[in-house]
């Protein structure tokens, strides 16, 4: 890609956007349990007479809200810095759908994996090593859907909806698995 080659920038902008989202979410997910572990509150949470699934729901919801707030800032900045000179398609607002579906999946899977990496020495690296392969199908589908929405080429919107359906199916399966496995992750 050369400077001024507007089509080239738009063609890989979906991948750049999701790389930005993944790395910022990994930073936030690494810190999601830091307050509880540093002050010893995690033991108090575990002693409370509530189901561990409720703890997962609360942590996943707080991680989701954090990620949505980060995206509220970073996505407009991404458009300003990377796509300000590019011609965007009229379908560009459709990127909100893969952003929402992808963020839900990142928060759900990331909550489970960050819980598993709480007490490890290199938890920052371990979370990235665990997260990226596990979340690859979700990221692939979201990058595909985001790229289609940004380019807006006629006849490719079937790919958008297929990718979005794949991401939503991933969310359902992986969040259900995380919900069921969270008690074991907390106990270890």
Which ranges hold each PLM region?
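Transmembrane helix segments
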Residues: 113-162, 166, 170-172, 176
